[in-house]
A protein has these predicted regions:
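Non-catalytic terminal regions with compositionally biased, polar/charged low complexity
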Residues: 17-21, 43
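N-terminal amphipathic, basic helical "cap/leader" segment at the start of enzyme domains
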Residues: 2-6, 10, 25-172, 176-177, ...
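Conserved beta-strand/loop scaffold segments within soluble protein domains that form the structured core
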Residues: 131-133, 137-426, 440-468
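Extended intrinsically disordered or low-complexity segments
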Residues: 14-15, 339
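Short acidic (Asp/Glu) and glycine-rich catalytic loops that position anionic groups and cofactors
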Residues: 18, 33-37, 396-397
């Protein structure tokens, strides 16, 4: 009998191609005040940011490692380089990007996607953006889409100072404090009042450096009555040492505004993905999260929505695929503060080859959140007896005038369904891949076509060789 292939050994093709490490600058490994000072000087931070970084480091050193969730014992910050500057500064014209970096992003389809269906693109390589551009017609609407470094030091400096790490503070948890100390790169977006951005903006993050971390900061403000769809993609080649991603996303959705934030995460399976995402939604505002998590060795990701305004809404649609050697602990959180607020979580988790998938949901309804409604649905698919799937719901309801529900289901692939598809001419492997793709359809149907195709390809890649 042929030995069953392991997901961790599958060739991830374009994602796992490593570039030669030819950095302009690589910070020494570890976390000390001297290293943070050096980073701040390297980036020419304003004084308030220099102080913020050092304060965040102090908080990081004081805070304990979370005592719940997956083990992160394999992550040693003394062996992580927190800043790696590529040899190219940021370009606004694709042809000016160095050829080797350009080749990497072209393999990932970034310039093609920009030409076909995006209003603007930011591409980050290790710790800094190497490309950033927005269409003229979008900029003419007053939409600001730039890198965080330019926003921090340029004409939007006051806005950055007002919003930066106010929603996610360094005291939230240890890795939020780490982010505050060493953040670099990321995107800044401001959509003016009443502006409807009809096609998405996208940022793509690629970590090529071995034994390094990526700590980009994304700050988006969608003003009153405006709307935006923002796409985020992530990948890295696999190494035999730990890499770390501890980015931060802060989203401000103003009165009657709407923001959809879509993510396809395909980190390599030596990655610790400890990301923090949060949205603050004002009266009548809508936040929609669409999330696909396929990579990393350990993943902890729980986008949080604070429904501050009356009649504000949140929707979270997610899929997680945990294969061999993966422990993906994901979910979503919502806090209902305003009256007549509503939240809906609809997730799918898939585990195979001993992978562990955990879904955590947290619903908090404050005392004044009269007539709040919340629905949580989690469905899990285990493809073998070695895998594991857990659901950990938490509810804190402080008013009687609320309707809150939770539903969880765990199952396996029906042999009858596989046999039926095989009778129609499909191989067993293709039949199982098709069933799993259909199970994850809740996310793929919410994505633009190119990204839905990429997600389904990732599922097929993970399923390859799963039949012994």
């Amino acid at each position: 009998m042929k030995e069953k292939s392991q997901v961790a050994d599958i060739d991830r093709s374009v994602y796992d191609i490593r570039d030669k490490e030819d950095d302009a600058y690589r910070m020494q490994e570890g976390l000390t005040p001297e290293i943070i000072d050096k980073l701040s000087k390297e980036k020419d931070d304003p004084v308030w940011m220099q102080q913020f970084r050092l304060q965040s480091l102090q908080i990081y050193n004081e805070m304990p490692v979370p005592d719940w969730g997956p083990s992160i014992e394999g992550l040693d910050m003394d062996h992580i380089a927190t800043y790696v500057r590529p040899k190219s500064d940021m370009k606004n014209d694709w042809k000016d990007v160095p050829q080797d970096i350009k080749d990497t992003f072209e393999r990932l389809g970034i310039p093609q996607a920009e030409r076909k269906s995006l209003a603007g693109v930011g591409a980050q390589y290790d710790s800094e953006l190497v490309y950033h551009n927005v269409r003229d017609e979008v900029a003419a609407q007053g939409v600001v889409y730039t890198d965080m470094e330019s926003a921090l030091k340029g004409e939007y400096a006051d806005m950055v100072h007002k919003y930066f790490m106010k929603l996610v503070t360094p005291r939230d948890h240890k890795f939020a404090a780490l982010h505050g100390a060493v953040w670099s790169g990321g995107s800044f977006v401001y959509v003016p009042k009443g502006v409807q951005v009809s096609i998405p903006l996208q940022s793509y993050f690629r970590l090529n450096a071995k034994g390094a971390g990526q700590f980009e900061h994304t700050l988006i403000i969608v003003d009153e009555g405006a709307s935006l769809h923002f796409l985020e993609g992530c990948s890295a080649p696999k190494y035999n040492v730990a890499n770390l991603h501890a980015g931060c996303v802060e989203l401000y959705v103003k009165k009657n505004a709407k923001l959809r934030y879509s993510t396809i995460e395909n980190w390599s399976k030596n990655m610790y993905n400890l990301n923090t995402k949060r949205a603050l939604v004002e009266e009548g505002g809508v936040i929609e999260w669409v999330s696909g998590s396929f990579g990393s060795h350990v993943g902890c990701l729980y986008p949080m929505s604070v429904l501050k305004g009356d009649n504000s809404k949140m929707e979270f649609t997610g899929v997680t695929f945990a294969g061999a050697g993966q422990n993906l602990d994901t979910g979503a959180k919502v806090v209902h503060i305003g009256r007549n607020t509503s939240s809906y979580m609809n997730t799918r988790s898939i585990s195979k080859s001993g992978g562990i998938s955990t879904f955590r949901s947290s619903v908090v309804v404050q005392k004044g959140a009269k007539h709040a409604k919340s629905s949580v649905s989690c469905q899990s698919l285990m493809l073998d007896s070695e895998s594991r799937s857990d659901t950990v719901p938490a509810m804190d309801i402080r008013t009687k005038d609320a309707a809150v529900g939770h539903e969880a289901k765990i199952g396996s692939i029906s042999n009858e369904a596989v046999f039926y598809l095989m009778s129609r001419g499909m191989s067993e492997e293709d039949a199982r891949a098709l069933i799993v793709s259909g199970f994850a359809d809740n996310v793929s149907k919410e994505l633009p076509l190119e990204y839905a195709v990429e997600m389904n390809n990732l599922i097929r890649l993970e399923m390859k060789g799963s039949i012994g």
